[in-house]
Curated annotation (Swiss-Prot):
Residues 169-180 have a biased composition (Low complexity). Ras proteins bind GDP/GTP and possess intrinsic GTPase activity. This is Ras-like protein rasS. It is a lipid-anchor. GO terms for molecular function: G protein activity; GDP binding; GTP binding; GTPase activity; phosphatidylinositol 3-kinase binding. The gene is rasS. Residues 168-194 are annotated as: Disordered. It comes from Dictyostelium discoideum (Social amoeba). GTP binds at residues 10-17, 57-61, 116-119.
Amino acid sequence: MFNFKLVLVGPGGVGKSCLTIQFIAQKFVDEYDPTLEDSYRKQTTVDGEECLLDIYDTAGQEDFSAVRDQYMRTGEGFLCVYSITYLQSFKEIHRLHNHLLKVKDLDSVPFVLVGNKCDLNEYREVSTAEGEELAKKLNCKFLETSAKERINVSESFYELVREVKKARQSNQHSNSQEQNTDQPIKKKKSCNLL
């Protein structure tokens, strides 16, 4: 069984906890209770393979950035969530993505962009096209979800697992190439008996 450390990041109030609870327990939590930190574990099957997902739901508030940064350092894949009904949450994504790369000290990480609350289309402030364009700029997958209506909830987590798998395979491939190129070429020695 493969283990994955997945982290939800995004501004406060966008529905990170609701997505997580809907995925873990198949229920929708209506009231907003700001998260400091929560962790969950779920065993599931993705593309025919058994997976154990450790899911870390982080605080959106800047007051808890040290806790969030710790999860960023240890996480393998990131579900970055904004609300389609709140333009400011969308505007914060690029900064959050850059901060994540800085904390991880990497050029790229497995990352899925999620526009949540698509059931509230009449209050939409961020178009689907804007989400798709940002995902293209960030070179990541994009889905619109609704924790309330259970739209694309599981698929967003599964897509992130797929991205982590790709990154692991890419790292294994590059590590094996580095080992091959870093090894000095050994000359064959012959033994002469006199």
